[in-house]
């Protein structure tokens, strides 16, 4: 698996919060389609936090609202902690826990692949976080290495992040849209069937486990890894293999085979994974009591931001500033954006952009 080429963080005119505000700027730490992320310091607690800036206006869509509302409801050690949203003159800012260890993806790229014990250590934490999400009736729908962060401890704690594609069965209907990243997407999603988001998350967890163990994606053609059509075909036919020279225990191979099952009705479930023999081996004590896991997060000095306040801020953020409207007009008049996937089958039901993201809800 080749490391993704990280684009340089372009300077952007974002407001540094004023002296009267709660956070002080430290440095820029990331950028993407959403905007930019900054490392900030909480003036009161001195804690480092990550602040994700999204430009006010049309970028504040239902995905942003869903991300914030779902993320706010989750309080678990294996999920990046949501703190609050703030409205600046030009951006909506989402304040959350800072994971100093970076992406799990980067750790695998540096290591090549993990030992079976190390992969299990992170997989146990991933399943713990996903199990909690499902207990809260939230399906992530975009689980991948880039959406799993690590804290800075010697034995890193895994943190699930980015709930932009998440769906709540309490607040939303049964998932019917095609979202996520092709390498991680379950067959039933690609077939545009109404699907169980929890079982689709299981498949994505299986892809994450495979990559940790093998150092490559299970359904990519090694000769043409960027051929997304071929990746999709291999997912639909569940065509994958484990290198012959890779020494994995029979129990590990068996678990992978129970995850990569095309029919979601016969695929292993999260509760079944948590009782699997391979999963339970060397299970850390703090992961054994799921009820205790959800209560480890206590911040009495910082009450949770109310839902009414959040919805009001999001509503105001949908109104673009004058500066942003002018910039949008300029960009529309001067840029001719090419679609890198023009050669993708025009009759295909799936739309994929150049980053490999499934971009249209079908």
Swiss-Prot record:
It holds the Pfam family Pkinase. Its EC number is 2.7.11.1. The active site is at residue 142. Keywords: Abscisic acid signaling pathway, ATP-binding, Kinase, Nucleotide-binding, Serine/threonine-protein kinase, Transferase. It catalyses: L-seryl-[protein] + ATP = O-phospho-L-seryl-[protein] + ADP + H(+); L-threonyl-[protein] + ATP = O-phospho-L-threonyl-[protein] + ADP + H(+). The keyword Kinase applies. Residues 23-279 form the Protein kinase domain. Expressed in seeds, seedlings, roots (especially in tips), stems, leaves, shoots, flowers and siliques. Together with SRK2I, key component and activator of the abscisic acid (ABA) signaling pathway that regulates numerous ABA responses, such as seed germination, Pro accumulation, root growth inhibition, dormancy and seedling growth, and, to a lesser extent, stomatal closure. In response to ABA, phosphorylates the ESCRT-I complex component FREE1, which is required for ABA-induced FREE1 nuclear import. Belongs to the protein kinase superfamily. Ser/Thr protein kinase family. Interacts with ABI1. Interacts with FREE1 (via C-terminus). This is Serine/threonine-protein kinase SRK2D. It comes from Arabidopsis thaliana. The lineage of its organism: Eukaryota, Viridiplantae, Streptophyta, Embryophyta, Tracheophyta. The gene is SRK2D.
């Amino acid at each position: 698996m080749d490391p993704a080429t990280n684009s340089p963080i372009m300077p952007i005119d974002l407001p540094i919060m004023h002296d009267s505000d709660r956070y002080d700027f430290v440095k820029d730490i990331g950028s993407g389609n959403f905007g930019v992320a900054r490392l900030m310091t909480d003036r009161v607690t001195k804690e480092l936090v990550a602040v994700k800036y999204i430009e006010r206006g049309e970028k504040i869509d239902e995905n942003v609202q869903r991300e914030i509302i779902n993320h706010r409801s989750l309080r678990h050690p294996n999920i990046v902690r949501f703190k609050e949203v703030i409205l600046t003159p030009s951006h909506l800012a989402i304040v959350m826990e800072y994971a100093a260890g970076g992406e799990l993806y980067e750790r695998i790229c540096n290591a090549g692949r993990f030992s079976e014990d190390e992969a299990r250590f992170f997989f146990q934490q991933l399943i713990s976080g996903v199990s909690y999400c499902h207990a809260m009736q939230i399906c992530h729908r975009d689980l991948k290495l880039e959406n799993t962060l690590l804290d800075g401890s010697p034995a890193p704690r895994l943190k699930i992040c980015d709930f932009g594609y998440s769906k709540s069965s309490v607040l939303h209907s049964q998932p019917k849209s095609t979202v996520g990243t092709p390498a991680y997407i379950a067959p039933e999603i690609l077939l545009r069937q109404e699907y169980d988001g929890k079982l689709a998350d299981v498949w994505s967890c299986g892809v994450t486990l495979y990559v940790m163990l093998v150092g490559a994606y299970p359904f990519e053609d090694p000769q043409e890894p960027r051929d997304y059509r071929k990746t999709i075909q291999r997912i639909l036919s569940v065509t994958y293999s484990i290198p012959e020279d890779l020494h994995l225990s029979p129990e590990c191979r068996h678990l992978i085979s129970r995850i990569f099952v095309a029919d979601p009705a016969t695929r292993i479930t999260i509760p079944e994974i948590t009782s699997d023999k391979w999963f339970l081996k060397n299970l850390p004590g703090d992961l054994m009591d799921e009820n205790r896991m959800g209560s480890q997060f206590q911040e009495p000095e910082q009450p949770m931001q109310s839902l009414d306040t959040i919805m009001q801020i999001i509503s105001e953020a949908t109104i673009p500033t004058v500066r942003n409207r002018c910039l949008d007009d300029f960009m529309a008049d001067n840029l001719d954006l090419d679609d890198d996937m023009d050669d993708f089958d025009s009759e295909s039901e799936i739309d994929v952009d150049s980053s490999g993201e499934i971009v249209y809800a079908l």
